[in-house]
């Protein structure tokens, strides 16, 4: 895939990632990848003031969320099905920047992320490699959070362990200004586009998961399926629809 490549400094590890995901320099591309010392960052060449995007499992936001974890306040704990010593295996079929997958792994679940876009996959792989080396989280992150580069619609064909839970957070259209995400995430959406196959992805997920499928939706959005939603958990801005497998 073609993208503008900018090197702030040479990094052998990141150069290997660029080769692995076949990312090649394109002088005319409006999106760029910045090799910023020890991290890979996506940035908007048309807006140099916009903050670059990177996957950082050691961020202050993640640290705060983990440090202040309370069962009743963490919605992913409530929808996951975790009970006592039971920690379900989770397949995140819409990995994005890996934020929710990281929380599932922090909670004790073994998580596999699937991502088909080579640029996003490179960002995730970079974040994982740095996270694995972190002194605070690396010891458990290495055993709980992993990435598969593939199309989620083909996950029935992937020879992986059948997960207990499949998690879906598909992109959805925004109908009014107040519902728009931050500018950096709007830019990220431009890269990966909308998920026009979300309903089909839910159908595939219900054929694979053992126990449940969790679909994250905005509070105003219609369910992905006309079938009955078995359970619903709501927050201020989102709704988590839980379906049973076929």
UniProtKB/Swiss-Prot annotation:
Subcellular locations according to the entry: Cytoplasm
Keywords carried by this UniProt record: Cytoplasm, Methyltransferase, rRNA processing, S-adenosyl-L-methionine, Transferase
Source taxon at top rank: Bacteria
EC number(s) reported in the record: 2.1.1.242
Family classification: Belongs to the methyltransferase superfamily. RsmJ family.
InterPro entries cross-referenced by the UniProt entry: 16SrRNA_methylTrfase_J, SAM-dependent_MTases_sf
Catalytic activity: guanosine(1516) in 16S rRNA + S-adenosyl-L-methionine = N(2)-methylguanosine(1516) in 16S rRNA + S-adenosyl-L-homocysteine + H(+)
One Gene Ontology MF term: rRNA (guanine-N2-)-methyltransferase activity
Cellular component aspect of the GO annotation: cytoplasm
Residues binding S-adenosyl-L-methionine: 115-116, 169
Disulfide bond sites: none
Described purpose of this protein according to its UniProt entry: Specifically methylates the guanosine in position 1516 of 16S rRNA.
Protein name per its UniProtKB record: Ribosomal RNA small subunit methyltransferase J
Broad class of where this protein is predominantly found: cytoplasm
């Amino acid at each position: 895939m073609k993208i503008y490549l900018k090197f702030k400094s040479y990094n052998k590890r990141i150069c290997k990632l660029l080769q692995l995901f076949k990312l090649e320099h394109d002088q005319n591309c409006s999106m760029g990848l910045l090799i910023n010392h020890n991290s890979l960052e996506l940035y908007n060449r048309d807006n140099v003031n916009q903050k670059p995007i990177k996957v950082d499992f050691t961020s202050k936001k993640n640290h705060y969320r983990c440090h202040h974890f309370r069962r009743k306040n963490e919605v992913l704990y409530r929808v996951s099905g975790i009970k006592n010593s039971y920690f379900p295996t989770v397949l995140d079929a819409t990995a994005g920047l890996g934020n929710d997958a990281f929380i599932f792994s922090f909670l004790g679940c073994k998580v596999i992320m699937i991502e088909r876009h080579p640029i996003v996959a490179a960002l995730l792989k970079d974040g994982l490699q740095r996270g694995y080396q972190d002194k605070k989280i690396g010891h458990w992150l290495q055993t709980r959070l992993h990435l598969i580069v593939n199309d989620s619609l083909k996950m029935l064909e992937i020879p992986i362990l059948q997960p207990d839970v499949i998690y879906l957070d598909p992109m959805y259209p925004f109908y009014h200004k107040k519902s728009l995400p931050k500018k950096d995430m709007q830019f990220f959406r431009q890269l990966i586009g909308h998920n026009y196959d979300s309903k089909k992805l839910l159908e595939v997920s219900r054929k694979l998961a053992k126990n449940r499928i969790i679909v994250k939706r905005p509070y105003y959005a219609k369910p992905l399926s006309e079938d009955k939603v078995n359970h619903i958990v709501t927050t201020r801005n989102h709704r988590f629809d839980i379906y049973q497998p076929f």
